[in-house]
Amino acid sequence: MKPLSETLTELGIAFSFPIEIKDANGNRTYYEYSNGCCWNGEYNCKGNETYHEDGKGYWFKLEYDSNGNETYYENGTGYWYKREYDANGNRTYFENIYGNWYKYEYDSNGNRTYHENSDGTKRGTPKSAKTCEGKVVEVDGIKYKLKAL
C-alpha cells in the first residue's frame, strides 16, 4: 500500500500530518503518520471493523454475527479462528487453524457451567447430562443413576 502522502506530493496538493480519512459514520478508514507509517480499514454498517491493512502489507479481516459478535478472523499469515455464540452473546465455541477447539455452556445467569477442549479437558456438567431422576447418565464413560437434582 502506497502512503497517501506520496500521491498528494506527486499531485502538488498541500497536506499536514497526521493524514486522517473517516467514512460517513465517523470510522477511521485511513491514517498516516509523519514517518510514513499508514493503515487503512473497512467497516460494516454497524461500525465493526471488517478489514485492516498497514503500509507493510500486513492485513486481517473480521466477520460478525447479527449481534455484533466476532465470528471469524483471518490474517495475511494464514492464521484464522472462528467463534460461535448463544442468544445471550456468550461464546459457545472456538476453533483455530491448529485444530484447537473449545466448547462452553452457560446457565441462565450467564455463568459458565461446562468447558471442554480439544486436549480432552472437561470441566463442569454438560447440559446433556442433566436429565430426570432415575435416568442413567453417562459422563466421560462412567454411568450414573440420577437422584433428584
Language-model features, listed with the residues they occupy:
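Extreme N-terminal leader/activation tails
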Residues: 1-21
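Short, low-complexity, charged amphipathic interaction modules
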Residues: 4, 129-149
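A detector of tandem-repeat and repeat-rich interaction/domain scaffolds
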Residues: 16-129
